[in-house]
Amino acid sequence: MNVQENVLPSIELLVLKRDGRTVSFDQDKIFSALRRANQELEHPVSEAGLKIVLEAVLAEIGRRFEKDVQIYEIQTVVEQELLKAHLYDLAELYIQYRTRRDFRRHQATDINVEIHKLLSKDQSVVNENANKDADVFNTQRDLTAGIVGKSIGLKLLPAHVANAHQKGDIHYHDLDYSPYTPMTNCCLIDFKGMLAQGFKIGNADVESPKSIQTATAQISQIIANVASSQYGGCSADRIDEVLAPYAELNYQKHLKDAKDWVLADKQEEYARAKTQKDIYDAMQSLEYEINTLFTSNGQTPFTSLGFGLGTSWFEREIQKAILNIRIKGLGREGRTAIFPKLIFTVKRGLNLEPDSPNYDIKQLAIECATKRMYPDMLSYDKIVELTGSFKVPMGCRSFLQGWKDENGQDVTSGRMNLGVVTVNLPRIAMESAGDKDKFWEIFAERMAIAKDALVYRVERVKEATPANAPILYQYGAFGKRLAKTDAVDEVFKNRRATVSLGYIGLYEVATVFYGGEWETNPEAKDFTVDIIKKMKNLVEAWSDEYGYHFSVYSTPSESLTDRFCRMDTEKFGIVKDITDKEYYTNSFHYDVRKNPTPFEKLDFEKIYPAVGASGGFIHYCEYPVLQQNPKALEAVWDYAYDRVGYLGTNTPIDHCYACDFEGDFEPTERGFKCPNCGNSDPKSVDVVKRTCGYLGNPQARPMVKGRHKEISVRVKHMNGSSL
C-alpha cells in the first residue's frame, strides 16, 4: 500500500543514515515497518488504525524537525506515538524488530558469534560453498580465517556499502577474502606464455617443457598456485591448441627413436601410436591432479578447460583424450569428475555440421555430455557477437569483453575480473509494492550503492603489489611480467580487467507486478528486459568514467539464492511465488518449476545476454536420461548455436553402487537417495547435480537449503514423448 495521499502531511526533510549518508525522508518506510510488526500480532491493528498512527508520527516529526532528522529520532517518535495510542503490543513488536536489526548489525562484525556458528556447524557457514568439505582441517582453517576476513572487511568497506550488504539490499561477494586482502576474482591464465617462457614457483625456476606430460604437470602446478592467489575460478582457453606443440615434441622424439629401431614404412605409425598414448596419459594425469589438489582456500580449484577449435592431428587427439577420459570416470568405480569443468566449442564449418572436419569430435562431446553432463557448449559465432571476440568464460560464467592491446592485438588470456557486487532485485520490487515509478526510484538508489561498492573493489585490488602474488603479476599468469615495484594497475587499467554488477531474480521481480505466470506476457517480458538494458547503460557510463570494464553479470547465486530469499522472508513474510519457494531464481532463467520445451526456454532467455548481460551468463536445459538418445541433445545444441552463446546440459547421471541403479535420485530434506533401494551413503552413491555454473556432489558436500530446494523442484524440459 502506498500511503502518500493528500490527507497525510507532506514532509521535506533529509534523513541522516547510520552509515553517514543523507537521503530524502520517505514515509512509506515508516508504514512498512509498522506493517511488518503488525503482521506478527495475534490480533493485528486494522489498516486504518495504522494509518492514524502514521499521521500522528508525521505530524510530530513535522513539528519537531525543520531540516534534517536522525534515524534513531524517527524511531523514537514512532515508539512514543504507539504508546500514546495505547498500542502496547504493537509497540513492543516494533521495538523488538528494530532491536533485532541492530543486534544483527553488530553480530556481523563480531568474530565470536561467527566462530560459534562454525563450531556448531551452522549450514549457512559450512555449506555456503558446495566445493568445500567443512569436515577437513584445511577447510576449517580457511573458514576460520574467512570469518576474521569478513569481520574486518565489513569495517573496511564504505559504511553505506557495508550497511546495504548486511541488510540484504546488495551482496558484496567473497567478503571472506576481499577487501581484507586486495585479491582478484577469476581469470583466464596465460598458459601459452607461461609454458613457452618458463616461470617461477617458490624456489623453483621452471623451464619450458619438452613433452606433453611435463606440460600438463606444469599446468597443474600453475593452477594450484593461481587458485591460491585469488578467490575465483581459473580457466584455460583453447587448451588443445596450447598443448599441441608439446605433444609434437613427443612425436618428434618417438620418430627419431623409430628411425633407429623400426622399419621405414612403420616409423610414422609407431610415432603416432606412442604419441597418442602419451597424450592420453598426460590428459588423464591432469584430470586426476586437478581433482586431488587442495588450494590454500580449502577447496579443489574451480577450473575450466576450453577446447574444440584445433584441427591438427595433435589438437584432435588432445580433444578426444579429454572427452574419453571424462567418459571413463575417476577410480575403479568410474565416478563422475566434478573438475575441471569442460567447455567444448562448436563452430560452423568446423564441427557443427555432419560434413565438417571435426564433426566426429562433436559426436564424442555429445556422448560425454549425456553420460557426465560436461562438456558445456560454447557457440563460437554467438560468443563473438555477444562479447566482441572469442574466449571461454573465466571460472563458470564470467566473460571478458573483446580488448586490444597497444599493438592492436586481440588479448584474452592473462586478463581477469576484479570482483562482483550483486543487487537484490526482488527486494526492490517488493518494496515498491507494485508501483513502477517507486521501483525505478529504489533501483536508482541501489545501483548508486552498487557503483560505490564496485569502485571500492577496484581501488582496493590496486593496492596489491606484484610481490603479493608473484605467479599472477611477475611470472606471467596475468599475461605481463611486472617488476616488484611496478603498479599492478598495469594489468587492470584501460578496460583490460572487468568488474561485475550482478543481479538475481528477474522472475520474482516480474511476479510482483504481473503474477507468477508472466512468461507469455509481452509487457512483463519487456519490463525485465528494460531492467537489464538500464543496468547495461549504467555500467557503460561507469566504464567511461573510471577506465575499467564494468559489466552486467548474471550471478550464479550458489548460496545467495538462499541468503536473499531468507532475509526477504523475514522482511516481507511468505509471498506466493516469491519467498514461499525458499529460493530466488538465478538471473534471467525461466522459472525452474515450469516445463517449456528446450527450444521454448532458449528462445525466451536469449534476449537477456544480447541486450546487456554479456559480462556473465549461461543457459541450461533439463533432460531425462539421454544416454540412449544423444541425437536429442544434438538437436538442442544445433538449435542453440545461432541463439545463445553458452549452454549447459542437466541430465540424470546419479549412480547407486549398492543396487546398480543409474538415473535420477530422489530429493530428501537435506540430500538425495536412491529411488530403488533408498541408499544415501555418500561412500556408495555418486550424486551429481548442477549446483550453479559448476557441477557439485551434494551427497558428499551438501549445499545451502535454498539451492537444495531449487534443485529439488527443477522440471524436465523434455519428456519421453519428445525424445
Question: At which residue positions do the language-model features occur?
Answer:
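Short, mixed-charge aromatic SLiMs
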Residues: 56-62, 82, 527-541, 710-722
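Long insertion/accessory domains within large nucleic-acid-processing enzymes
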Residues: 678-723
